[in-house]
């Protein structure tokens, strides 16, 4: 599906506030709320819009430990590892990477004990290097994708 400039404007507004009313979007781009809703539905159906989300403060939720785990496979058990990753809520992000490591995992937990348990479970798939975050200095939700600048 190709998106046009109107779809792009709708995406920009939704990116700033996913809870914005269709009517309000319509007022900003000179369309009816129903027409906006139809365009949004079409973008959802075509996979342009995959989900709507919230952003929580992990520290206020009690998740005070953030770790980055470079993971090195010791066998060709990638499918098993991916299934394991999918079941673990402590792993908030997982990326297949180039270089020496096979995967980069972002782990967010509320205690060292939980982190240690996860790391022990990972050992059946390979080895890791662990980097603990001391302080988050920037967190950016990629709104630049929706920028027209």
From Swiss-Prot:
Coiled coil: none annotated. It comes from Bacillus subtilis (strain 168). The keyword Nucleotide-binding does not apply. It comes from the Bacteria. InterPro entries: AsnC-type_HTH_dom, Dimeric_a/b-barrel, Tscrpt_reg_AsnC-like, Tscrpt_reg_AsnC/Lrp_C, WH-like_DNA-bd_sf, WH_DNA-bd_sf. Residues 22-41 bind DNA. The gene is lrpB. The keyword Transcription applies. GO terms for biological process: response to amino acid. Pfam families: AsnC_trans_reg, HTH_AsnC-type. Gene3D superfamilies: 3.30.70.920, Winged helix-like DNA-binding domain superfamily/Winged helix DNA-binding domain. GO terms for cellular component: cytosol. Residues 3-64 form the HTH asnC-type domain. Negative regulation of glyA transcription and kinB-dependent sporulation. Keywords: DNA-binding, Repressor, Transcription, Transcription regulation. This is HTH-type transcriptional regulator LrpB.
């Amino acid at each position: 599906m190709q998106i046009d400039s109107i779809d792009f404007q709708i995406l920009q507004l939704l990116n700033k506030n996913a809870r914005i009313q269709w009517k309000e979007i319509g007022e900003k781009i000179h369309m009816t709320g129903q027409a906006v809703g139809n365009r949004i539905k079409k973008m959802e159906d075509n996979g342009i819009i995959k989900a709507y989300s919230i952003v929580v403060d992990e520290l206020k939720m009690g998740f005070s430990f953030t770790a980055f785990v470079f993971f090195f496979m010791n066998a060709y058990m990638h499918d098993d590892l991916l299934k394991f990753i999918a079941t673990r809520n402590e792993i908030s992000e997982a990326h297949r990477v180039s270089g020496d490591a096979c995967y980069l995992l972002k782990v967010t937990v509320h205690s060292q004990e939980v982190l240690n348990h996860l790391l022990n479970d990972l050992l059946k798939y390979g080895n890791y290097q662990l980097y603990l975050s001391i302080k988050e200095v920037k967190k950016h939700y990629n709104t630049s994708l929706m920028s027209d600048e």
